[in-house]
A protein has these predicted regions:
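Conserved acidic
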Residues: 71
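Binuclear metal-dependent hydrolase catalytic cores
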Residues: 1-67, 75, 149-173
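Cap/insert and terminal regions of metallo-dependent hydrolase folds
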Residues: 56, 63-65, 74-168
């Protein structure tokens, strides 16, 4: 299945190089559980069409729940599984910060990438509807953006500031 997805990504996203897509993949069912010591992990399919096999994850300890959206547009599966999470870690496509670049990033490429991710004007709604306590944003597209503006957009729907994720960030749950 991975070969067909790899081919689809290259064609759909109009990538110049496919070197970053060469890695080993292990496939599993659409939904299920994994237990690691005292942590129960639920994996569930999210909507990243046309690319198949995208998953979110909920981690359960005795008293806490952390949900990771995975690469997805807003979808029912995420909303169900993220309910009442102490932390929702969610990707975000910051559409107002990304522009066409001649020969590199076409208008169609931007449209196609936005189509299967969660735009900044919707991620706060997802967090609010999931009733999460904290929202941590990550997997930023583009990687450089106005943090204050993003927080303001998300706060409008979520009702509080999101946490802007970064490498090695520690969050008390």
């Amino acid at each position: 299945a991975w070969k067909s997805e790899r081919k689809l990504r290259i064609s759909y996203e109009r990538r110049k190089s496919s070197k970053a897509l060469n890695y080993k993949v292990y496939e599993f069912k659409k939904e299920g559980f994994i237990n690691i010591n005292d942590i129960k992990i639920k994996y569930f399919e999210v909507d990243h069409k046309p690319v198949p096999y995208a998953y979110g994850f909920s981690f359960f300890s005795k008293k806490k729940k952390l949900t990771i959206s995975g690469d997805t547009r807003p979808c029912e599966s995420l909303m169900i599984n993220a309910q009442n999470s102490d932390v929702l870690l969610h990707e975000v496509f910051i559409e107002y910060e990304i522009n066409q670049i001649s020969g590199l990033r076409s208008k169609k490429t931007l449209h196609n990438v936005k189509e299967y991710h969660t735009p900044s004007n919707l991620v706060g709604k997802v967090a609010k509807l999931s009733n999460c306590k904290k929202l941590v944003l990550t997997h930023f597209v583009p990687t450089r953006f106005n943090i204050s503006k993003l927080k303001k957009i998300v706060r409008k729907d979520f009702g509080k500031d999101p946490i802007i994720g970064n490498d090695l960030l520690t969050i008390n749950i």
